[in-house]
Structures are given as C-alpha cells and as structure tokens.
Amino acid sequence: MIGTKSKFDTYPDGKIVVLGGSTVKEDVLLAIGKQLGIDKTRFEICLDYDALQKYNVRKMQYAPQYRVILCGPAPHSGQGKGDSSSIITELENSDAYPRVERLVAGNELKITKSNFRAKLQELVDEGYI
C-alpha cells in the first residue's frame, strides 16, 4: 500500500514516528535505523499497545518537525482519533498529519524487523528521509 503524502511541508530531517504494538524491541529498531544511516534521535517510538490508547496523535497536527509516521497494529480507540474509526484512519484521512506508511506483514498490520528495514530503505531511496 502506498502511504499518504503530507499536505503540508515537513522538515526533511524531521522525526520518524513508529506507532504500533510489537514484540520487536525499540533498541532493535533503532539499530536498524543506525545501519541505514539514520540517527536514533530522529525516532519517536511507541510500541506498547496499551500506551497507544493514551498517545495523543494530535501533537503531530501541522507540526513540520514530524516527517513520517510508520504504523503497525494499534487500538481502534485512542486520543486524537476524532470521529474516525481508528487512530490510523484519522492519521491517513486528515490533511493535518505528516505522511503515513503502514507496516504490513502478510495481510495484517505488523511491525517486523524486515518490513521496518524495507520501509526505511524505501524512504531513504526515495530521498524522503
């Protein structure tokens, strides 16, 4: 699936947000980023499924310091989802958020080492991050 493009300008060296429940540890994701030449300070990561319900996505509205949001499995309810059916739907359908990319394994949202690496590599190759 092709990610949604940001409707406003974001900083090319902005934050890479990773949202979604995962068994892959944050340190592993940061190491993958480092292997691709991405500094760990660029990442903002929330991998705890329960913590995602309290994660306020609205802080990223029209915030150019956020470059891209990588989404794995997330609760349907959560802060900032507005009238949307889920947090991810809100992020994808609103012009107020930076570019959104889904991390998918098989036919389901899932954060794996391989799809995380592949998505980051795709964004690097594209010159987006």
Where are these regions (language model features)?
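Redox- and metal-dependent alpha/beta enzyme cores, enriched for Fe-S-associated oxidoreductases
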Residues: 7-57
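Alpha-helix C-terminal capping/helix-to-coil transition sites in glycosyltransferase folds
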Residues: 62-64
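Short acidic, S/G/P-rich loop/turn micro-motifs used as interaction or catalytic elements
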Residues: 22-26, 50-52, 72-79, 107-110
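Structural motif
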Residues: 50-58, 110-117
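Extended, charge-rich low-complexity interaction segments
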Residues: 66-88
